[in-house]
Amino acid sequence: MLKRASFVEVNTASLRHNFSAVKSIVPKDAHIMAVVKANAYGVGAIKASEIFLQEGAHYLGVATLDEALELHSHFSKTPILILGYSPNSNASMLIDNDLSAMIFSLEQAEVFSQTALKSQKRLKVHLKIDTGMHRLGLEPNFKSIEIIKKIRALKGLEVEGIFTHLSNADAKIKTHAKNQMKAFNAFLEQLSNQKIEFQYRHAYNSAGILSLCNGNENRFLNLYRPGIMLYGFYPSNGMKETCPTILKNVISLKAQIVQIRSVKKGEFIGYGEHFYTNEETLVGVLALGYADGLMRALGNRIQVAINNQLAPLIGKVCMDQCFVKLNNIQAKEGDEVILFGDKSAKANDASEIAALLNTIPYETISTLSKRLERVYI
């Protein structure tokens, strides 16, 4: 039984379909790291990980220690890589829970190694190489090769992987992404020439998987990191229009009408006098607000689906509640409202909501609060 009259509905068959789409694109012998950071982009990390592991994922990718620990408590035998920065103070917890960390400096590698040796253990690490994102990583040059040699010599570390991150593989013109891969491949060859090899070599995110697997840029890769595509979204609208791979919607934001009010003409609805009733207005109140992830800016800007009818969201979205106008809408208290989700029910999908807010669906779904229950169908 739901504890609130609002929830996130997750289509598990679509999750499986989208993972199968990844498998159909990457090389047959490739390993797949399902990226489940940010609560699996709002879907729910535990259930999503369970499904991806059932479908053949070899690795899980997250951004923070807390995310990794949550997954480790459920999937203790599954390798988990923290793709984001891990402070030195996290070293003991990384080691004790057999987690893998991203590193990009000799100084941090030395701290991690010393901590591991005190526990008579080894910490698995993946080296981050900056090929053009200019966020984190070692430069792909001779100096970094010497640093990598020193890192590999540390007794408390097991350097199991090396990777880079593509910043613009969803662009129509792939020049930058291909230049990144050219730099990464050249660096891998330089390392190999000095007998420096890695169990895992990875670079492709969803955009790379969807657009760059037909060339030879991925010839040295054996691990792939799908993220947003697992949840039914293309990395950009341009890719959605041109990509032959079919992805299925996974996530819908839903709420029930908890009260219907008749408000006379000449009144304001909600905070700040942002909606004026120029006629007698039937107002449905939903127990859903911006603290749940429904952006405040959507008030007076979108229509929501109620019993296959479209009704406007009116007034400013409150922290915990919002309003819909029900004039000429067949609805009653307790009826379900789809704020965004499956278009077969006439609702906007999250990418359309994102476009309206001049953002991306990654933000629309990953900001859905954990206080919303996830209902898996």
UniProtKB/Swiss-Prot annotation:
Any one of the GO CC terms: cytosol
SMART domains reported in the protein's UniProt record: Ala_racemase_C
UniProt-recorded Gene Ontology molecular function terms: alanine racemase activity; pyridoxal phosphate binding
CDD domains named among the record's database cross-references: PLPDE_III_AR (cd00430)
Domain of life: Bacteria
Matching SUPFAM superfamilies: Alanine racemase C-terminal domain-like (SSF50621), PLP-binding barrel (SSF51419)
Binding site residues for substrate: 135, 319
Key words of the record: Isomerase, Pyridoxal phosphate
Cofactor(s) of this protein: pyridoxal 5'-phosphate
Biological processes per GO annotation: D-alanine biosynthetic process
Tagged with keyword S-adenosyl-L-methionine: no
Reactions it catalyzes: L-alanine = D-alanine
Class of enzymatic activity (EC top level): isomerase
Chain positions with N6-(pyridoxal phosphate)lysine modification: 37
Pathway(s) where this gene product acts: Amino-acid biosynthesis; D-alanine biosynthesis; D-alanine from L-alanine: step 1/1
Residues at the active site: 37 (proton acceptor), 271 (proton acceptor)
EC number, as in UniProt: 5.1.1.1
Entry similarity comment: Belongs to the alanine racemase family.
Role summary: Catalyzes the interconversion of L-alanine and D-alanine. May also act on other amino acids.
Protein name per Swiss-Prot or TrEMBL: Alanine racemase
